[in-house]
């Protein structure tokens, strides 16, 4: 394991061309405007029960598409519950049904988790360039402000920077008294360098 980020960036769009997935994408993309105008609940309440279905993704077991849908629906669900003048007590079946299905498949509760908010919610502005604070943006957000995006993209970069430490720690766990001391030192130095890079990124959080 090198990092908690996927080896390739998360999907920004569904490969499967189903109307329900287009509906999910449209609502997720519109969340900043829907929240600003207090129209999230109105938008969702007009939908029929299966208009946000993810059954095709579960049937195909398309992992990256499933992660994208989990992120989309998590944002939509939280926006519905908390985006009005007062918190909603009931989440409509049109959201809860597909959300719970995805949650059961992934083995985690239906909530906007760190995975859906950060690990599966980024892309590189320039695909040819490495992950950096100047080259990472969010797929989904609530209001789309600088503070919201910056807080999450910093965590993406931290996860990337910590990758060498995770890799070195794993290699250290495989060493024993028969290994050369240089093997230990090399990996310990990698951990130190990695953590210094992580702390440097952390220091930019207030910016």
Predicted segment positions?
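Extended amphipathic alpha-helical segments with heptad-repeat/coiled-coil character used for oligomerization
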Residues: 185-207
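Hydrophobic faces of stable alpha-helices that mediate helix-helix packing
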Residues: 155-169, 195
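Long, charged all-alpha helical bundle/coiled-coil segments in cytosolic proteins
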Residues: 46-139
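Short, charged/polar, low-complexity loop and linker segments
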Residues: 134-152, 168-175, 179, 186
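Charge-rich, low-complexity segments
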Residues: 35-46
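Long, hydrophobic, amphipathic alpha-helical segments used as structural scaffolds
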Residues: 84, 169, 173-180, 199-206
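Intrinsically disordered, low-structural-confidence terminal and linker regions
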Residues: 1-35
